[in-house]
Amino acid sequence: MDSVSFEDVAVAFTQEEWALLDPSQKNLYRDVMQEIFRNLASVGNKSEDQNIQDDFKNPGRNLSSHVVERLFEIKEGSQYGETFSQDSNLNLNKKVSTGVKPCECSVCGKVFICHSALHRHILSHIGNKLFECEECPEKLYHCKQCGKAFISLTSVDRHMVTHTSNGPYKGPVYEKPFDFPSVFQMPQSTYTGEKTYKCKHCDKAFNYSSYLREHERTHTGEKPYACKKCGKSFTFSSSLRQHERSHTGEKPYECKECGKAFSRSTYLGIHERTHTGEKPYECIKCGKAFRCSRVLRVHERTHSGEKPYECKQCGKAFKYSSNLCEHERTHTGVKPYGCKECGKSFTSSSALRSHERTHTGEKPYECKKCGKAFSCSSSLRKHERAYMW
């Protein structure tokens, strides 16, 4: 009677892949492996006393990849502890209905009833070549097509897909086809729509406990990710990575049209609309359209009269955060904008620009009635009121 173990269906990372993961992604990996383990346990021998929560305090124990096990031991030993023993493998009776589809070889198309049998078959394609690991005496499998080495048949199977054009690999647990290496990024609850992890503070629910933990920080105010340069803290690791680019100057997202680069992909997306002319965000009051949702929200305040930015010193409210910042300088006395001609300083950049026109003689604001020009818009408005009386 054939059986399938947790190792047969768990996905493994190479050392290089694992090093690229940040803490939140490692937490997600742990959650996905826990989901798979739970699904297998639910159809296995009910008498087996498997303490899943205790097992997953040490996620390295369930990794089939030898290289990743060593990473957990060496890099994160103090956090995760020892690796799993073989006793944690869960043997399942194949006659129990698991919904597993037959496993097909991506090289020759031969079909097998279980993933472990497919692994053994894969050896016929790679030549079953072994050599010693440089880190320890473990034996590694060697691909005869490209020479790459792997410790587990799971990794070999995944790797062989890169040498074929037969399309995506069909995962051993779920019916939906996947392209490695993301085969187990989403557990079954993703496809059923089930969201089992519910927030205690609001009605939101999530597929993964790691997503719930991140969301709960929006309620608690916890910001565990701190910038090493300036000390600023963030709720999410992705926000920290984006912030760090403000120190490094890194701008990895480049416009193909003009070559302008941006620190965030969202900024690039907004910029690209300057080339396409796309303005997908439309005001329902007046029909005016905008390139990004933020500008639309700011515009909508001209209709609603909303002034969400309030001064803590005097209570005066403003439509825009920039106006609040300028106003607060009237309390602090800070004048960061200095004139290069005479050295006079101002609280806002607009006030500086108006002042600079006294040096250049520029008068861009012209009265439509009489043609008289002014250096600042406020002077033009005062002049226009004279016609109203």
UniProtKB/Swiss-Prot annotation:
Pfam family of this protein, just one?
zf-C2H2
What this protein is reported to do is described as: May be involved in transcriptional regulation.
Q: Which keywords are on file for this protein? A: DNA-binding, Metal-binding, Nucleus, Phosphoprotein, Repeat, Transcription, Transcription regulation, Zinc, Zinc-finger
Question: Gene for this protein?
Answer: ZNF670
Q: Where is the KRAB domain?
A: 4-90
Annotated GO molecular function terms are: DNA-binding transcription factor activity, RNA polymerase II-specific; RNA polymerase II cis-regulatory region sequence-specific DNA binding; zinc ion binding
Q: What is this protein called?
A: Zinc finger protein 670
Tell me the domain of life: Eukaryota
Q: Which family does it belong to?
A: Belongs to the krueppel C2H2-type zinc-finger protein family.
- Specify whether Transferase is a keyword of the entry: no
GO BP terms: namely: lipid metabolic process; regulation of transcription by RNA polymerase II
Zn finger limits (C2H2-type) = 103-125, 141-163, 197-219, 225-247, 253-275, 281-303, 309-331, 337-359, 365-387
Can you cite an annotated GO cellular component?
nucleus
